[in-house]
């Protein structure tokens, strides 16, 4: 449904005042109106009239995040908005941020129509992204997860696992996870691998020697893409409510199984977001 156009202030767009004047004074000559139009023309090179494209794009995603706080939406719909925010943020870094970084690397920095240089835009975006991520996790942990728990939907952390659930997760790891994961040791002969875009990975600090007698202080464990990130606990294990466990929690719990004879000193999960702002070359 079409809505009535919003009125803009005189200092933002003087041309509208001319239109209004012509409507109330139809006998005004075209020559006089054209002269007034030229004297009131906007300087299109003035950066005040432009919004930075990347910042505007990110502001849109902030509006998506705000919908996750809107109590007028159903609970699962609010959770869905939180997921959309994450998906949009991935795409934003793949396309927009990668484009800005490419400009920095080229050394040919030029300000945009808004007057901001790529380095300035990146600094602003990084500050705003940190604040948005803090807000995202606050909404998840303080609002959505407690509300879901009241509806008997639980996302179980490792410290919440019962003995029965612990035994089930160990069986799931042995049968489903262990056979499809190949850890990657990092040493001078094995540099950092090219990981799949947006895949879940773990980087580990190790102590001791592997089965071949080699010392490897670092290793990467890529999570299998064939398995779901969220695993539903069977009813015969937990009959009440709907209970879920993250695949990352299971891997983290049993990650030492990949390195017999070695001690895992640290285990941290990470993702790599790659540049997807590709340029098409002309084929002659």
Describe every region a protein language model picked out.
Residues 5, 10-284:
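N-terminal non-catalytic structural scaffold regions of very large proteins
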């Amino acid at each position: 449904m079409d809505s009535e156009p919003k009125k803009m202030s005189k200092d933002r767009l003087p041309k509208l005042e001319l239109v209004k004047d012509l409507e109330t004074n139809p006998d005004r000559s075209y020559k006089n109106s054209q002269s007034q139009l030229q004297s009131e023309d906007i300087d299109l090179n003035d950066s005040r009239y432009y919004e930075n494209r990347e910042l505007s794009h990110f502001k849109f995603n902030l509006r998506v995040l705000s919908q996750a706080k809107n109590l007028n939406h159903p609970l699962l719909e609010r959770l869905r908005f939180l997921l959309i925010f994450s998906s949009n943020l991935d795409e934003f870094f793949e396309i927009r941020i990668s484009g800005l970084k490419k400009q920095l690397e080229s050394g040919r920095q030029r300000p945009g129509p808004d007057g901001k240089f790529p380095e300035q835009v990146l600094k602003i975006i990084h500050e705003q992204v940190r604040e948005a991520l803090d807000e995202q996790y606050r909404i998840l942990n303080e609002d959505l997860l407690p509300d879901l728990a009241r509806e008997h939907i639980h996302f179980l952390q490792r410290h919440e696992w019962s003995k029965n659930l612990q035994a089930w997760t160990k069986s799931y790891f042995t049968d489903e996870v262990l056979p499809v994961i190949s850890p990657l040791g990092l040493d001078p002969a094995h540099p950092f691998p090219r990981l799949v875009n947006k895949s879940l990975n773990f980087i580990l600090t190790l102590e001791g020697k592997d089965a071949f007698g080699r010392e490897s202080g670092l290793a990467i464990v890529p999570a299998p893409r064939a398995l779901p990130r969220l695993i539903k606990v069977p009813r015969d294990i937990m009959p009440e409510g709907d209970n879920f466990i993250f695949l990352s929690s299971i891997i983290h719990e049993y990650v030492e199984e990949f390195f017999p004879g070695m001690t895992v000193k640290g285990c941290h999960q990470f993702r790599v977001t790659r540049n997807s702002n590709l340029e098409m070359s002309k084929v002659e």
